[in-house]
Amino acid sequence: QRQMCIRDRSNTESLNIGKKRGFLTIYIGYSPGVGKTFEMLSNAIELFQSNVDIKIGYIEPHQRDETNALAEQLPKITTNFTKHGSHHFQYLDVDRIIEESPTIVLIDELAHTNISRDRHEKRYMDIEEILNHGIDVHTTLNIQHIESLSSQIELMTGVHVKERVPDYFIMSADVLEVVDISPE
């Protein structure tokens, strides 16, 4: 099931003089596993097949074969790696995305906290920078990560969420696409 809210932001300027700010599309769902990344990738493949310059900037590794198969059908921008303790992590390469400057870049997990905080503490800050370079971004978010809703959702679910995205960022989205699993 899908619902879509679209805003007209045709006059939105970026911080770069003369360049329009990129458009932000957020695929939002009530919990992990409802199909946000799958939906984002499915829509991206349709755009790619229509000759839109669309690339994957970062997709969270999934245990779902169907999602991974979709990701394999799209070009990818090389990611960076960092070490934290004994673990190695893959992360978004903001410089490379800006350098390659696709029309649209896919970036999974909007609420993510960056382990390597050399540039920005949070992924939504990375996305803001990319948008300000005129690149459209499609991203995913679980509703419990919205700052103004997280405490209410914690009361209902008993689950505390540390990673939060400020309301102003959500409100800046050009498209909010609600993704939900059918009760069947």
Q: Where is each model-derived feature located?
A:
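Pre-Walker A adenine-sensing motif
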Residues: 7-20
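Conserved nucleotide-binding/hydrolysis micro-motifs of P-loop NTPases
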Residues: 46, 60-65, 111-112, 137, ...
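Loop/turn-to-beta-strand initiation segments
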Residues: 53, 101-104, 133-139
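Conserved ATPase-coupling elements of RecA-like P-loop NTPase cores
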Residues: 109-124, 148-151
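Internal gly/pro-rich beta-alpha loop/helix module
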Residues: 139-184
